[in-house]
From Swiss-Prot:
Transmembrane segments: none annotated. Keywords: Glycoprotein, Secreted, Signal. The keyword Signal applies. One of its GO terms (cellular component) is extracellular region. It comes from Caenorhabditis elegans. It comes from the Eukaryota. This is Uncharacterized protein B0403.3. It is found in: Secreted. Glycans are attached at N246, N252. Residues 1-23 form the signal peptide.
């Protein structure tokens, strides 16, 4: 049971600090419709436990993309993280009476797919050093461009400067996410021979769900036109040609370029 008296002061701090998280992390605003403080206490306790367990500040030192070393280092870390996460959702449900919560990375790992992560933790642990080093080197330096067709579409739709900026940033984000997914799946195939299929499925499910959340956030605000063709290409259930026609070849070339860069970095393992 969460100690609300102990953490109410922490909640006040969280109002001004904890919510200054990176844009890609979403703690649903709908939580605060009827319970403006209760959910913050649950979240604050969870982040406090994360810091105590892993000696990292969640909002600034934990990364959802790629999967953070703190979570996949070993089975003990995974279970410790998920035990605290399950407590958080129990707090939201029992103390705050919040029965429905949106997708989040920790919810995906610990509530929706814990058994899959647990079964494949050895492979995730073995590949983590490559993901954090080599994959990061590749994915943080990939060539990211906007097609001329989409530049023309933004002009035709009279995008504002802010909308253009958001479009470009979202496209970059999708490129980086897709790169990490491809890279992680590639290294799994090289390192985890016996469990490669299952481990790749775990990674694919995580990244697919992450991208689905990205689209949902834009669509919720009626801004899905800011989701680029490439973003739609790598997001399950989306049509890459919905807003800009004949983008398949361009997106194929983008993905092929990523795959070639990844293969080049890991050629020593071939």
């Amino acid at each position: 049971m969460f100690n609300f008296i102990t953490f109410i002061l922490f909640a006040v701090v969280c109002i001004s600090y904890c919510h200054k998280s990176r844009g890609r992390r979403h703690f649903g605003d709908e939580y605060r419709i009827n319970t403006p403080a209760c959910d913050i206490v649950c979240e604050g306790q969870w982040k406090s436990e994360f810091h105590a367990n892993f000696h990292k500040i969640y909002d600034t030192e934990y990364f959802e993309i790629p999967l953070d070393t703190a979570i996949v280092k070993n089975r003990a870390n995974l279970k410790m993280f998920c035990s605290s996460t399950i407590q958080k959702y129990s707090c939201l449900r029992n103390e705050c009476k919040i029965q429905r919560t949106p997708w989040s990375a920790e919810k995906h790992i610990c509530v929706g797919h814990f058994d899959n992560f647990d079964r494949n933790i050895n492979c995730l642990s073995l590949t983590d050093k490559y993901v954090q080093r080599e994959c990061s080197n590749v994915c943080n330096s990939i060539k990211i461009e906007i097609s001329q067709a989409e530049i023309d579409r933004m002009a035709e739709m009279d995008f504002s400067r802010q909308e253009k900026s958001e479009f470009v940033e979202q496209n970059k984000h999708c490129n980086v996410i897709a790169c990490y997914q491809l890279c992680h799946e590639y290294i799994i195939s090289k390192v985890c021979i016996d469990s490669a299929v299952a481990a790749r499925s775990v990674v694919k499910s995580y990244y697919d769900s992450y991208l689905e959340r990205e689209y949902t956030e834009l669509n919720k605000d009626d801004q899905d036109e800011l989701y680029s063709s490439f973003c739609r290409r790598v997001t399950p259930g989306q049509d890459e040609n919905e807003f800009t026609a004949n983008m398949t070849r361009y997106n194929n070339l983008t993905l092929d370029r990523m795959k070639n860069d990844i293969r080049s970095v890991f050629s020593i393992l071939d």
